Structure formats: structure tokens, C-alpha cells
Amino acid sequence: MKVKVEKIDNPSQLNIESVEVHNDNNFSFKFYTYGGYIHEVNIPIMNQEDKTEDVLLGYGNIEGVLESNGYFNSIIGRVANRIGSAKFSLDKNHYQLYPNTPPNHLHGGKVGFNKKIWKIDNIEEKSNSIKCVMSYLS
């Protein structure tokens, strides 16, 4: 397994990194620290040595990710799914949330975890696996 981390140039001049992982069987994937967005999943094409194909539906570049209002391929939160009428009660306290999909609150609101830059805390490489720990303090 091989890991490559590099800074990504982007029009917003944000400190975004990409993490690219390759194995010996010609599989690879790439994700960004911006929203934990999974950018590519490349698999070998049968009977075509050293050729791969990206099988992930997504944006072609970081600009598409930055401009998107979507959540797919990203870390979502603080909640996953929809909170009806953008409000809830907990321990007899009532909370009103931002209705980013009126009248509901979806996947963390106006600026969810998909729009945050995550910090790479640790990358652990082994012969047959990779572990990447990221964090975001909110």
C-alpha cells in the first residue's frame, strides 16, 4: 500500500490536501480533507493491464466540490438525515435549527461537516491496509 498526501490548489485558497491510496492490485482512491470528500475510486479494467477506471459518481475537480450544495461522498453532520421542521426537543429543552432545506434541517445545516477542512491526525500504513484518522474541532 502506498499513500501520497499533497496540497490542492483551489480558487478559494483554502488549505486543502488530497490523500491518494494505491495498492499492489492497481486499486486506488483519493479523498480531500475538505469535507472528507471521496474524489475517486479507481478499479482495474479486466484484460487491460495497468488501466483503471474511476467508478465513483462525483465532481471532476475541487472547484465542483467547493461550489456544490450536495452532500454525496462527504462527511455529513452533526446529524445524518433530516430533522423535520428544523426543530427538536431534548431533556425538556426545545431547539430550533437552521432550515437549510425548508422547512427541514438536513445533514448539519447551513455549514455542515461537508464544508469544513478536516485535519489529518495520523496515517498508518501497513502491508495490506491504510488507516487515516482525521479530526475537526467544532
List the predicted regions and their residue ranges.
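Surface-exposed acidic/polar loop and edge beta-strand patches at domain peripheries
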Residues: M1-S138
